């Protein structure tokens, strides 16, 4: 009996164990199948995401390409410091600029009756740019008139022979301060070694010029007609040339030397040319120093030497010029003029050097503005006519409000040896250029 029961029990136990093992195996297979299905689903999602990423990348690349095409195919407009329009390919430009110089002055009278008042010293509108490889510039000064009297620069220019050729109405290459922009001159008026004195009334001439420049040198030559834009036709001709060299030219220090020469030959139709001195500021008394009559066919020859430097906030500049004015009957007359001027930027700043033209620019203005203390002594003399000389002392202050605006104050004390006059002038200028 007992063996039978024992055998039955063993049979039941074995069958239960086998059944349990089979059940567990089935569960394991089911779990493995489920995991495989989940893994396959995940792989499918990864593939889908990769395809989407590739597609989006293609879209991004295509979009960037389209934006590049859009940027290169759009005309650019810049309104900083004026209005400038540039074509998409950069081959065409047009820029509108201008300057407003508004003056007020009063005289400390001596022997000459003078009138203090206000006036627009300059009111210019400028159009410049480039087209088909040529540069162009047209400038009208409405303070001098709306016709040819107010015409200033009017020329075309093209890069050639390692430099630039200019054709039209522009300044001959002579005198450092004459070639400095009126927006950047140190005092309200230029010294006697310029069209303010030695080349009175001959600031812009019609002709052709060539200028070549490097990092520390310039060399320029001009051949011109003695006719200005508003003067009568003439067969008189002239020539001028200037060279400069800056042995020191760094971001904070510049030392400049230069020299120039000018020849003016009067001929049929030429007007008189003269050297004169407004020794007590603009609209003050004037003294003629020498004259060459146009009908005589005589000449005027001049040369000048330049030295200037800018070291940190300190600046100096000087020129010496000698001119010979031929006379039809009497001996020739020699004119000598020289000036020395300087400045100190009281709260920092530096007058940078324009290596392309061999002159100095205004300092770059920070948010707080810049104060500049200025001084100049200026002298001109006819060495062959007794007491035909004049001089002036100028003390001033410039305040650079920003890159476009400057306020100037000048006190000028003049002296005329010929008449004994010692008129003085107080002058203020508000200047805006764009």
PLM-predicted stretches and their roles:
Residues 31-34, 50, 139, 189, ...:
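Acidic-residue sensor for enzyme active/binding pockets
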Residues 7, 21-99, 346, 351-357:
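N-terminal periplasmic/intermembrane-space "pro-region" immediately following the signal or transit peptide
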Residues 111-112, 261, 270-434:
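Outer-membrane beta-barrel pore domains
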